[in-house]
Structure formats: C-alpha cells, structure tokens
C-alpha cells in the first residue's frame, strides 16, 4: 500500500512539472489543462510559505477548479501543495461546492484568471 501511495505522489509531482502552464494577467496564477470537469490552475507564492497542516514550506499549489463566472462563484475541487523541490506537502479535497471568494484573496485572483481565460476562448 505504501508503494502504491509513493507511486501516486510521484506521478502527481511529475505532472506538476510537465504541464504547460499559461500565465494569466493575475500575479502567480497560471492556467493548465481545461476539461469538461474543470480547469487545472497553478498558483505560485511570491515567497515559500507555511500552510496550516503542512509539513514544510510551500512554493506553489495546483488546484482543480470549477467556475460560475456569471455569478462570481468558484468551486475548488482539489488542491495539491508542493515544496520548491517538487515534493508534495499536502493534498486536500473540498466537497463544499461553489462559494463566493473573499475580496483581494488568492481565490478571487484564481476566479478572475479562470473567467478571463474562459471568455477569451469563446
């Protein structure tokens, strides 16, 4: 079981390095793979930082998100937090659903970046 978990984490880590991330006009936010189930985004912190429940400093995270741009709502489905060396710090799933984002937050920047990207592809 431990070997399977290690293989899974290595696959996620290598996927974060191999993805083609498109920079958005919002600092630190990059757009990745777009699917019918959501959009993968990457957020890079200006400086590595500690997160609650993490086991080290985080340099960036990758999240699968769904957006409701018409109503300014974002659903963060899953987050994977990484250290600078690419090792996984924490994986979180969020069964909450769509929510308003706090003004001037990372979530609001992600929502704006995703909605801007989606409107440019219409």
What is the role of each PLM region?
Residues 17-122:
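N-terminal secretory-pathway/extracellular module detecting exported/lumenal segments
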């Amino acid at each position: 079981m431990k070997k399977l978990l290690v293989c899974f984490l290595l696959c996620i880590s290598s996927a974060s390095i191999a993805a083609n991330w498109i920079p958005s006009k919002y600092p630190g936010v990059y757009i990745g793979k777009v699917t019918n189930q959501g959009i993968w985004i990457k957020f890079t912190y200006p400086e590595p930082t500690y997160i609650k429940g993490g086991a080290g400093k985080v340099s960036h995270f990758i999240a699968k998100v769904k957006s409701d741009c018409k109503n300014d709502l974002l659903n963060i489905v899953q987050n994977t937090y990484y250290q600078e060396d690419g090792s996984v710090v924490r994986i979180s799933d969020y069964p909450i659903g769509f929510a308003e984002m706090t003004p001037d937050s990372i979530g609001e920047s992600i929502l704006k970046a995703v909605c801007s990207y989606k409107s440019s592809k219409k």
